[in-house]
UniProtKB/Swiss-Prot annotation:
Protein name: Glycine amidinotransferase, mitochondrial
Enzymatic class: transferase
GO cellular component: mitochondrial inner membrane; mitochondrial intermembrane space
Organelle targeting peptide span: 1-37
Localisation: Mitochondrion inner membrane
Gene3D superfamilies: L-arginine/glycine Amidinotransferase, Chain A
Catalytic residues, chain numbering: 253, 302, 406
Gene transcribed to yield this protein: gatm
Record EC number: 2.1.4.1
């Protein structure tokens, strides 16, 4: 059985111990259920930059890649690029992750550029965001500019590309290791190429580099008859644990994982299957534990606009997508904050996401957060929490599917590995 307790320091109080295994079992299927009940299964230990365990933290801090959570002081970050953003072909996995009012858009423009004027404005917004990050003392890295309109073909499928806008989707930093995710969309099969020059440089300078097993993305990975006509259909299917991705082979987006020191929280979604989560669990054990949490969400794809851990014992929980295990966090002494309703207008295009990008924020440290300049309600929420807001307008960038957390991958945060749950 999986035991969880929160180690809380300072004014946050004493330890609290809670058992969660029985509450998670219903989320598991088949052998995945049995495997997750044991924390002693086969594991691959994380290797520090220096072999001597006594200097582990020091060695990790000397690596160019080092990040254990979502809130330690940010020193270096990758920011995505909107350049050449291409509409993905309207395949079954894209349909399962988008809202029906945009389906005609995908049917008409799949394989073509997103609206050029919109992308141009998004580029300007992200450039301004980079300037602000640099002003705040953060080193900013960017992926390569690539032509995503080129058609490619594998033995199993053919597609055009999409973009390198959301590094959070493809890269996950755990300690001194950078992990390339085996994403589930065919249009994102070669997205890693935009980041390889950066990753190779980090590797040469001492970081650990892992590429998860690349999926074939054969037809068997997808339920070709996934019965979606409306969001209500998806809600019912997700509630029954039915998703467009099957368990044919491991797949996951890095953005379906949320880090809190030694504990990492993941969700089964339309792009992340149990095999993918199991691969991560084995790969990161025994130094890290991966826990599955679930939500009342008709369109689960990425955890960070649903459940965003912004500090030790502090989490934003989407009121429209309540976490089924939220009482575990409350009983452990965590502060659960419900963010206000987003202010983004109904007529603003959001081709790949919901309005809840308002809570998809980037923590620069425990007391500074980068947040959308237009979301005045959430500014007030952070002020009440004693967190200063750094306001940047990225509304046009939002349309491409992400907020500040999505548009970034924190490469280096100044901190050490700690336990917040055990």
């Amino acid at each position: 059985m999986l035991r969880v307790r929160c180690l809380r320091g300072g004014s946050r109080g004493a330890e609290a111990v809670h058992y969660i295994g029985s509450m998670l079992r219903k989320s598991f299927v088949g052998w995945v259920q049995r495997s997750f009940q044991s924390t002693q299964a086969a594991a691959v230990s994380e290797k520090p930059c220096a072999a001597d365990e006594k200097v582990r933290d020091t060695a990790a801090q000397e690596c160019p890649v080092c990040s254990y959570n979502e809130w330690d002081p940010l020193e270096e970050v990758i920011v995505g690029r909107p350049e050449n953003a291409n509409v993905p072909p309207f395949s079954v996995e894209v349909k399962a992750n988008t809202y029906e009012k945009y389906w005609p858009f995908y049917q008409k423009h799949g394989g073509q550029s997103f609206p050029v004027d919109h992308v141009k404005k998004a580029i300007e917004e992200i450039e301004e965001m980079c300037k602000v990050l640099k002003h705040e003392g953060v080193i900013v890295q960017r992926p390569e500019v690539i032509d995503w309109s080129v058609k490619y073909k594998t033995p199993d499928f053919e597609s055009t590309g999409m973009y390198a806008a959301m590094p959070r989707d493809i890269l996950l930093v755990v300690g001194n290791e950078i992990i390339e995710a085996p994403m589930a969309w065919r249009a994102r099969f070669f997205e890693y190429r935009a980041y390889r020059p950066l990753i190779k440089d980090y590797f040469r300078r001492g970081a650990k580099w892992t590429t998860a097993p690349k999926p074939t993305m054969a037809d068997e990975l997808y339920d070709q008859d996934y019965p979606i006509r409306t969001v209500e259909d998806r809600h019912k299917l997700a509630a029954m644990g039915k998703f467009v991705t099957t368990e044919f082979e491991p797949c996951f987006d890095a953005a379906d994982f949320m880090r809190a020191g030694r504990d990492i929280f993941a969700q089964r979604s339309q792009v992340t299957n149990y095999l993918g989560i199991e691969w991560m669990r084995r790969h990161l054990a025994p130094d890290y534990k991966v826990h599955i949490i679930s939500f009342k969400d008709p369109n689960p794809m990425h955890i960070d606009a649903t459940f965003n851990i912004i500090g030790p014992g502090l989490v934003l929980s989407n009121p429209d997508r309540p976490c089924h295990q939220i009482e575990l966090f409350k009983k452990a002494g965590w502060t659960v904050v419900t963010p206000p309703t987003p202010l983004i207008p109904d007529n603003h295009p959001l081709w790949m996401s919901s309005k809840w990008l308002s809570m998809n924020v980037l923590m620069l440290d425990e007391k500074r957060v980068m947040v959308d300049a237009n979301e005045t309600s959430i500014h007030k929420m952070f002020e009440k929490l004693g967190i200063s807001t750094i306001k940047v307008n990225i509304r046009h960038a939002n349309s491409l599917g992400g907020g500040f957390h999505c548009w970034t991958c924190d490469i280096r945060r100044r901190g050490t590995l700690q336990s917040y749950f055990r």
